[in-house]
Each structure stands twice: as structure tokens, then as C-alpha cells.
Amino acid sequence: MSVTRREWLKLAGAAGALGLAPAIVRAQKLEKKEVAIAVGGKPLTYYLPLTIAEMRGYFKDEGLDVSIADFAGGAKALQAVVGGSADVVSGAFEHALNLQSKGQFYRDFVLQGRAPMIGFGVSTKNMPDYKSPADLKGKKIGVTAPGSSTNMVVNFFLAKHGLKASDVSIIGVGAGAGAITALKTGQIDAISNTDPVVTALEHSGDLKIIVDTRTLKDTREIFGGNMPAGCLYCSQAYIDANPNTVQALANAIVRADKWIQAQKNNLDAIANAVPKSYLLGEPDVYKASLRASLDGFSPDGMIPEDGAATAVRALAAFVPDFDPKKVDPSKMWTNEFAKRANEKYPNG
């Protein structure tokens, strides 16, 4: 296909805004084939597109050799990329904004979840008479890891109801069987986690949900707008140095997003595509957790336009030293890579 000089200049100019012009005008050769991705709670449905991209070979199709390191929570995964042991994080959208407030420039470049997919509830054993948020005062609340998005939902909920983060004790319980055990055995009074943990605890009768962000409707009501969730993000310096590698990562995640959408009426296919350990020995509960979270998965990897503004409001309520005036939300996300991925894979 021939490209006119005007078209070339337009394309190069648009790419230049992100420092990507060289990637557009050259052959798409990967700058790096080996990519280390850090994630906090890989088996969670929150990160299902990452696992699908891995298990179905989408990363390999792009010429990538991806290694994935799993941590106890998103905050730990973030520390890995900041510390240099990982290149990219599969983590919460708002983490890039929090980093920018500290003078570190990271950018979300492809979306996995368009809702936080987090359920916050109380133990039916320790808090059988729960009636209002005030009952949480002095209680032990389990989150995947302190500072993670599960922690953010707790603090946001507390702030909305006149409580402070210091009114409760936050305890890291991870994102798997350990989290389930912590609630069932009474080590914690409440829990904020994602599926399949939340659905498993609901299914066993151990959890009463008080906040649910697994659907777009509930998410918008709680946060006052779209609140993007799981993304791939990395430093702006990494994007500038490896735009083709970043594009390849986005391609793989967009394909995974679209594959998940195509299986909405075939949850067995999704359950069969993930490692058996994800099922926690209960395939039916895992499929029920998928059903509860289906609305929250991104259909195309595109970040909603109002997502950054919503994240700013959430962080202002969640992080004590976060100053909205010191950040530029437009610099913490881009849809350029996801757009090109959709052009390359319109049907997944």
C-alpha cells in the first residue's frame, strides 16, 4: 500500500507525541524479545487476560519471550518494576498516577479490566450483626497487600462514610487460598479481594458483600465515573526505548481481551484455558466467579477517556499525601498502542 507524503507526516506527527515516530516509519522489529512482567495475584480473574495471552501463545505469536513473576499484591509488583527486577507491570491503572505524584513517570498502555472487579465484605462469623460502615471501626480488614487496589477500595469506602484509614487495621492476606483461610478461620473480620476468592467465600457462606465493583454499573455509582482496573504499564523511558516491544505486548493483551469476550457463553473454555491451580479445586465456583466478573473485562484494551479523572478522585481520598494539583493525568495513559492492536486484530 502506498502512503502519500501528507499521510506520512500526519502519521509521524501523531506518533511523535509519544516519541514513537521511529517505530512507525521503520519495520516493526522488536527492540527487546525478553520481557519480565510483574503481577500481584496472577490467578485472580482481575488478571485473566494476562494469563490467556500467556497460555494461548499470544505473546509468542508477537515474537516475545515473556516471563511472569507473581507477587502477593499489586503494590509488590509495582516495587519490582521500580526496583528494576521487572520491565512491565500487570497492575492497577491508578498505580501509574500514584507514581507520577512521586516524580516517577509510568504509563498505562493497554487495558485488561474496565471495572476494579473487587468485592469488599464482612465475615459472617466475626461480624454476623453487621449493619453499617460504622461497624468496621477497630476491625481487621484483609487486602491482597497494603497499598494495593484492594486497599484503595476499602479506604475509598471508609472515606465516603466518614471513617479514616486509621480506624481499621489493614492486613495483607494475598490473593489465593491463604486469603480464604484468613477469613474462614477468623484471623480477619472483613476482606477486600477479587475473584475467585470473593465468590468462593460467598459460595461457602462465609462472606457478606457490602461493596461490589465487579460490574460497570456498581463501579460508576461508587467512584462517580469509569474506574479502569487491570492494565499493563511501564516507565515512559521503557516505552521510548522499546515502542515496538510495547506494541507487541498490547497486541497480545487485546487478542486475549477479545478471546474472553467471545467465550462469554462458554465459561468452560475459559476454565479449561487457565492452570488447574486457579480453580482452587472447585471448577464450578471458579466459573461462577467468571460469570460475576464478565461485565468488568475490557472488550478491546481501550482505556476510557474519563478514567484518569476518576482515578485522581479515588487517590485523593485514598492516599494522604496525594496532591491532585501536582499530577498531569494525560501523561499516565495512552490508547495509541491499543488502537493499533485493534487495527491489526479486529476480530481477536
Language-model segment annotations:
Residues 1-3:
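Secretory targeting signals
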Residues 309-348:
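Conserved C-terminal helix/tail region of periplasmic/extracytoplasmic solute-binding proteins
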Residues 61, 128, 215-225, 295-304:
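Short, solvent-exposed loop/beta-turn-alpha elements that line the ligand-binding surface or hinge
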Residues 7-26:
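N-terminal export signals
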Residues 48, 54, 76, 80, ...:
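Extracytoplasmic/secreted proteins, especially bacterial periplasmic and envelope-associated proteins
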Residues 16, 28-175, 185-195, 206, ...:
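Short, glycine-/small- and polar/acidic-enriched structural segments
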Residues 239-322:
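Secondary-structure end/capping motifs
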Residues 178-181, 185-276:
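Pocket-lining segment of extracytoplasmic ligand-binding domains
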